[in-house]
Amino acid sequence: MASPRHILLINGPNLNLLGTREPQIYGSTTLHDIEQASQTLASSLGLRLTTFQSNHEGAIIDRIHQAAGFVPSPPSPSPSSAATTTEAGLGPGDKVSAIIINPGAYTHTSIGIRDALLGTGIPFVEVHVSNVHAREAFRHHSYLSDKAVAVICGLGPFGYSAALDFLGRHMKF
């Protein structure tokens, strides 16, 4: 029996504050709630889901590299380099089939994350909780959208479900 397709869900800076940060924009659903609902949906679709959140660009880039089987360079010691992964036992060779990424503010600034995604060749869906096009002008540009398989924004937490559903039902790996 084939192993389930493996999806990596990456959340960028400040998304750990969902549920408390600007609830008038982002709502009251926490990142933990989103991850739990995503795990349930992924399981029902026959997908394996790993979640990862970091406020640090380099950690996100390293995790994207790791998703393709590349071993990241040893991290420099830093007390602020915390990142969270909800699945134990991930190794450098634990490749994924697709990535769902909410890059947060790095959407508008990170050529490094763009290059990491392109360098691995892993298809990805870009997700945003808020409608970035209805917000400040600096949020209207994404360094990822033109290379994403799909872009979902403004659907609140449901955007993650829509991305998983698309990957599980419609994308061929």
UniProtKB/Swiss-Prot annotation:
Pathway info = Aromatic compound metabolism; 3,4-dihydroxybenzoate biosynthesis; 3,4-dihydroxybenzoate from 3-dehydroquinate: step 1/2
GO MF term list: 3-dehydroquinate dehydratase activity
* Protein name, UniProt field: Catabolic 3-dehydroquinase
- Cited InterPro entries: DHquinase_II, DHquinase_II_CS, DHquinase_II_sf
Q: Known Gene3D superfamilies for this protein?
A: Dehydroquinase, class II (3.40.50.9100)
One matching Pfam family is DHquinase_II
Q: Which family does it belong to?
A: Belongs to the type-II 3-dehydroquinase family.
> What domain of life does the native source organism fall in?
Eukaryota
Give the multimer and partner information. Answer: Homododecamer. Adopts a ring-like structure, composed of an arrangement of two hexameric rings stacked on top of one another.
Q: Which UniProt keywords apply?
A: Lyase, Quinate metabolism
